[in-house]
Amino acid sequence: MFTYTRPVMLLLCGLLLLTLAIAVLNTLVLLWLAQANLPTWQVGMVSSSYFTGNLVGTLFTGYLIKRIGFNRSYYLASLIFAAGCVGLGVMVGFWSWMSWRFIAGIGCAMIWVVVESALMCSGTSHNRGRLLAAYMMVYYMGTFLGQLLVSKVSGELLHVLPWVTGMILAGILPLLFTRIVNQQTQTRHSSSISAMLKLRQARLGVNGCIISGIVLGSLYGLMPLYLKHQGMANASIGFWMAVLVSAGILGQWPMGRLADKFGRLLVLRVQVFVVILGSIAMLTQAAMAPALFILGAAGFTLYPVAMAWACEKVEHHQLVAMNQALLLSYTVGSLLGPSFAAMLMQNYSDNLLFIMIASVSFIYLLMLLRNAGQTPNPVAHI
């Protein structure tokens, strides 16, 4: 079976455009709020409303996919995101922006659930790792290019919103030329998110997504602060963050390929061990370039491999519900990780950022080793 089919390629093309729009807005909204001289707590509330929307969107998208299919769910998700974008220019103010960012958060989460579920349902045990690797490469590449766009174009609110909205609507176009079949609508069986979270044989995958959220959320959110406290200029901080993200992009396809060939368990063990090594190396400050590179290459690839593990433990009609559970787990981890790490850094030492990352990774490594005898390699239901 050919891995990158026409529907998959068109889906990833649409995702790239949507991710560009997401990256641009996520950066500029904070700047617009700062320019409006809003208090810090209000800026935090607007940011939190977006992530709250992510949680809400994650919860009901599975039902939507079951009712109207992948294509229409994708169209609806994109339109909701576009509405959240346009609303920022129609109504200005704390409460209105908090509402519009909540709506945008719902749309973004719906997009992620639809795309990830469609890829999982399109794949088999032999190529799901590569499909998810391609997904993450497109996502991080879109995020990276979005940051470049922010630095090259006008940042004025009414200048940005028209072309960003146009980019969102353009992201719909590729899927107008293909149809992604949802086999879940052809069965009477249904699964809930809670049932997937309780599924014992998939627990390693769920836990892996939580750990991935903690690791990536902490690195994304607090690494610039850590570097700033080391006395680095903004240009240097940007360079080192680019090294981190670039390593994550470059590591996706090899990790996905290795996971398909040698099994998820072995690759997960190696990834987590490398994250621990990278964290320890950052504490020594001996060689930041290789330390950051291996930390990014291993840390940014945990999520797709853990997701592939969990999805191989369920039946085909349960894939959408499982994907919702995994994305929810990742989101929870990405919210809790930075909050806890920031508290440790403020009260004790900046080095606790990497100590925390190494600690949670070590706990997950123990889980992987302990369960090795029970589930040596997951077998997919295809």
Curated annotation (Swiss-Prot):
InterPro entries: MFS, MFS_dom, MFS_trans_sf, MFS_YcaD, MFS_YcaD-like. One of its GO terms (molecular function) is transmembrane transporter activity. Keywords: Cell inner membrane, Cell membrane, Membrane, Transmembrane, Transmembrane helix, Transport. It is found in: Cell inner membrane. The chain crosses the membrane at residues 14-34, 45-65, 75-95, 102-122, 131-151, 157-177, 204-224, 231-251, 270-290, 291-311, 325-345, 349-369. GO terms for cellular component: plasma membrane. It is a multi-pass membrane protein. Its main location: membrane. Belongs to the major facilitator superfamily. YcaD (TC 2.A.1.26) family. PANTHER family: TRANSPORTER MFS SUPERFAMILY (PTHR23521:SF2). This is Uncharacterized MFS-type transporter YcaD. It comes from Salmonella paratyphi A (strain AKU_12601). The gene is ycaD.
